[in-house]
Amino acid sequence: MQPCLVKIRRIRSGSDLPLPRYMTPHAAGMDLCADVDADLVLEPGERALVPTGIAIALPDGFEAQIRPRSGLALKHGIALVNSPGTIDPDYRGEIGVIIVNHGADAFVVRRGERIAQMVFAPFVRAELLDVDELDETARGDGGFGHTGR
């Protein structure tokens, strides 16, 4: 498989944070670190936009998906509000991660903490065709649990 070449820029020069990286040889996502100057305390139910200190330039036809880290979700109830978040190939601003604390205790985001993961994926752009009717299928309009719980 041909790698997707992504240009990356540190927002603040001289940053001590590592660039996003794969943590295992077969990982699908690169971990993103929190670029906060001071500890950020999230009380239960609170959400915050956490900066990552990086901006990227994706090749046309690719997106970056920002996804939660399962360990933070399981151990602390930390999730992403818009999961997955999408970074479009024409966006050049800093990547921010909107996290929410669904846990019972306060959660502290510290500088350099791995808060999310970034997965690169190709996408297609659809053309919409306005029609009066759609073709029939066996499923029809069944949804929202129609096959069971």
UniProtKB/Swiss-Prot annotation:
Pfam families: dUTPase
Secretion signal, residue range per the UniProt entry: none
Keyword Metal-binding attributed: yes
Gene3D superfamilies the UniProt entry points to: 2.70.40.10
EC number annotated for this UniProt entry: 3.6.1.23
Keyword Magnesium: yes
Residues annotated for substrate binding in this entry: R69, S70, G71, N82, T86, I87, D88
Family: Belongs to the dUTPase family.
NCBIfam families in the record: dut, PRK00601.1
Name of the featured protein: Deoxyuridine 5'-triphosphate nucleotidohydrolase
UniProt organism field: Geobacter sulfurreducens (strain ATCC 51573 / DSM 12127 / PCA)
